[in-house]
Amino acid sequence: AADAMEMLLLAILGPTLRCEWHLSHAQVAAMTTFVFIGMLLGASIWGAAADKVGRRTVLLVSTALIAYFGLLCSAAPSYAWVVTLRCFVGFNIGGGAQSYTLLTEYLPHRTRVAAIVSNLLSWCAGGIFLVLTAWVIVPTLGWRWLTALAAAPLALVLPLMLLFLPESLRYLLASGREVEAAKVMELMAKENGRPPLPGELVSQQFTDASRRGHVSQLFHSSIRRVTLTLFPIWFTIAFTYYGIILLSSDVTSFKQRCPSDNSPTRDSSIVDTSCCRNLNSQDYKSILLASTGELVILPFNLILLDRIGPCVPAWTTTAFLFLTRGCAAALFNWCYLYTAEVYPTSIRSLGIGLHSAVARVGSMLTPLVAQVLLPQVSVSLAFSTYIGLNLACCCLAISLPVETLGRAMQQSIIVDDSSTSAAASGVDEKKD
């Protein structure tokens, strides 16, 4: 939920800072892009680190740094400082993806899907809370207070993480740390009022440190096709999801746009703020309703958005954004779940981190479509871009070679040819 607040904050800050600091469309888009540059780097680095030093350590450090740089951003004196600090926030949000890794490694396959998908409720709740807070705070106290309040929940939850968040048992076993894993299991049994398990805990699939979290393992022959297929899927889903977030504040305000924004003779070095407009109550209502669309898992075709335009009632646009965002959020959850299940423990964090980094490339490019191409060039061309990429994504998803439903999560890639396929590609049908 806290990560969702930091991400949705971009949709609020863009229009607000454009008016207050007389920013151009390109500068607003650049602010979002630099956040995703930070996330691209952070997802890769934190992902590799989580396979080396542990999921819990990465989550604790990245959470503390998100709160720190988020609070600093509230005191930023200029556009350059905002961009820089939001980039650092983005870098550490890249480490937040490891929460999915830690969660999936504790869940049995029978409840894994339901638990991961229910995470969507927390993400949605964070977004809704931020919009409601912005609705009250921005018109009265300003964006700086909103930025500080968005970072506050992370600072508050950090002590709880220190006290109650355990390290992943699968990670400890894959690292050969059976003694620590046994202590975690004893603590879990005590907290749940159950007797400790008898016998000695032994890992059958130990991975040495030199291979754990190594990029080359993602391209092992048994799993290479999965890796290469997931790259464009992650890119497209992030491109669409964050595009919809940005469109939530852009599409609803077409009628109030400056005519000079679309003028072919306009000097790009001159920022026209004569009709600059901050977000009003109707805009916040639209963004709020679009945010609740993440609760809706319904099939929806983006091409319908291209049919509406600005000459129809505002509720129609909002309804389509509601449905589209619900679908995009559902696909994001599917990506995290499938990626966590298809990779073995020895490279699971790296896999999620690297694919999340590829997704940030999509997130980084989508502002150029949602905040530049759409308002300044062509609405049809912008939505055609989203439609084409999603059609290609559908074809790639159908071609994925491994079904993870009901299969055990693997601990490591076995280098022996006779057992490689069972350990890495999911032939093993043992139950959790």
Q: Predicted regions: what is each one?
A:
Residues 1-432:
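Transmembrane-helix signature of 12-pass secondary carriers
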